[in-house]
């Protein structure tokens, strides 16, 4: 089944389906007509326009006042892509690069960018054949768009750069020859249309949101298992509490916990303690705040991936070519920083629950193991979780609060959204690991509540998990078990 590139709203849920099912892309007639119309308008306009047009007949950045002769316009765009491919550092995950291709294709399809049809089609060919450009994590200021990473993404279009194909990094020129593909000869404005845009930031945000929704759900399931293992109380999850402070995420979290724990023998037994620590009692408020943030950020990013974000913007129907600032990443940089904080907090409260489970309280043995002293048990997994959480807290410093002028002061305010994007991915990875460690601890602790049973739902998760990770009788090599726990929730 193919996904048709059109002007219909592209949702993150559908992007998840495109990626998970390996769908191919096909350019719809509406999008094709818009691309052709805009390119034709631009070509006609260039024949009789009497003024410089930024990035079309001029240099770039602070070189915007230098007019380029008509015979050099194609070379100008070629030079732009080559010269701006200055990324460095670690390479971007292949799945995020593939998202970059999808989102760039979508943005160009609206017909406000002035690109050739053949250019968009080649991007589609690369997506459909899993030919993924090698892109680097460092180099973008998040305005004028994601110049360096998008340059690396687009180098293969002109037969340059490297691509990942069938698990092997290849020179694009060699692969193009094997496939009998000709490099695209860029026309006026095309290089700028390809490089100006927020697709590096947006792709990271989309990938992170998909993971965030998964991790938020796991945080509830694992938190519910921990609550059972700690012999916690259900009263803080009663609906009456949350109806008088009606944040949607809080209400949803409390309802989810009531559902997860329905029928539990452990939750129904008489409790000796009057109340639970905040890391259990305030789960609806904390997990709920993260849910609300995820929901908000998702709405912002969905707006972004359905937008034209290059510059200048071409309006054929209005006979306008306008140099403006849709490439600026601030509208998504701030939400990405928010999402980083929301995910970090899921890990933060998770680590506190881990700590409580190993503390020798409420009938649980010290460090959840027999013969403590001879055995260290689950002592060090908590250290690992604490280390990860501390790193994530450091990464919560908002990248979007910073700006460094560039291009001789012409580009004097930037979003640093690309830095927000890459550290967001790191916090996603960190949160996944902390939740996996909590599951490792919670499952161990739950065994000490036997013969009482938890709810059907929690017991089902527990039984499935036990197929991968066993109960720990005595000290053993923990690292493989933590990795299996990560894989389990992935």
What are these regions, as identified by a protein language model?
Residues 54-68, 72-76, 83-108, 136-158, ...:
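FAD-binding core of FAD-dependent oxidoreductases
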Residues 7-99, 118, 125, 209, ...:
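Generic N-terminal targeting/processing segments that precede catalytic cores or assembly contacts
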Residues 91, 111-116, 217, 306:
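Alpha/propeptide regions of enzymes that mature by internal proteolysis
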Residues 135-140, 317-321:
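Cysteine-centered functional microenvironments
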């Amino acid at each position: 089944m193919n996904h048709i590139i059109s002007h219909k709203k592209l949702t993150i849920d559908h992007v998840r389906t495109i990626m998970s099912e390996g769908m191919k892309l096909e350019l719809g007639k509406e999008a094709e007509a818009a691309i052709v119309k805009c390119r034709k308008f631009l070509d006609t306009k260039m024949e009789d326009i009497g003024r410089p047009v930024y990035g079309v007949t001029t240099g770039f950045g602070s070189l915007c006042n230098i007019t380029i002769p008509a015979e050099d316009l194609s070379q100008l765009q070629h030079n732009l892509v080559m010269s701006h491919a200055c990324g460095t550092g670690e390479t971007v995950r292949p799945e995020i690069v593939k998202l970059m291709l999808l989102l760039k294709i979508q943005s160009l399809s609206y017909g406000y960018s002035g690109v050739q049809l053949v250019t968009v089609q080649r991007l589609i060919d690369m997506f459909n054949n899993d030919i993924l450009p090698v892109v680097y994590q460092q180099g973008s200021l998040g305005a004028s768009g994601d110049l360096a990473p998008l340059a690396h993404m687009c180098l293969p279009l002109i037969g340059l750069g490297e691509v990942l194909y069938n698990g092997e990094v290849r020179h694009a020129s060699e692969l193009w020859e094997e496939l009998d593909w000709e490099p695209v000869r860029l026309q006026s404005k095309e290089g700028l249309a390809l490089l100006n845009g927020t697709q590096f930031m947006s792709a990271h945000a989309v990938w992170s949101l998909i993971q965030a929704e998964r991790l938020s759900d796991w945080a509830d399931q694992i938190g519910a298992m921990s609550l059972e293992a700690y012999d916690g109380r259900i009263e803080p999850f009663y609906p009456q509490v949350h109806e008088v402070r009606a944040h949607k995420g809080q209400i949803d979290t409390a309802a989810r916990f009531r559902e997860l724990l329905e029928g539990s023998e452990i939750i129904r037994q008489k409790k000796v303690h009057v109340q639970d620590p905040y890391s259990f009692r305030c789960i609806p408020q904390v997990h709920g705040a993260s849910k609300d943030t995820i929901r908000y950020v998702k709405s912002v990013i969905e707006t972004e991936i359905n937008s034209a974000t290059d510059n200048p913007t071409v309006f054929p129907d209005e006979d306008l070519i306008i140099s403006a600032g849709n490439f600026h990443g601030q509208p998504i940089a701030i939400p990405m920083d928010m999402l980083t904080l929301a995910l970090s907090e899921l890990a933060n409260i998770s680590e506190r629950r881990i700590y409580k489970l190993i503390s020798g309280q409420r009938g649980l043995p010290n460090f959840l193991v027999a013969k403590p002293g001879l055995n260290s048990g689950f002592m060090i997994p908590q250290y690992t979780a604490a280390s990860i959480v501390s790193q994530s807290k450091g990464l919560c410093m908002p990248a979007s609060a910073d700006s460094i002028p560039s291009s001789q002061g012409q580009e004097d305010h930037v979003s640093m959204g690309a830095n927000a994007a890459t550290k967001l991915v790191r916090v996603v990875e960190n949160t996944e690991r902390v939740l996996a460690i909590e599951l490792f601890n919670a499952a161990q602790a739950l065994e000490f509540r036997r013969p009482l049973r938890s709810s059907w739902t929690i017991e089902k998760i527990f039984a499935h998990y036990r197929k991968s990770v066993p109960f720990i009788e005595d000290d053993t090599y923990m690292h493989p078990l933590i990795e299996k726990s990560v894989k389990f929730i992935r």
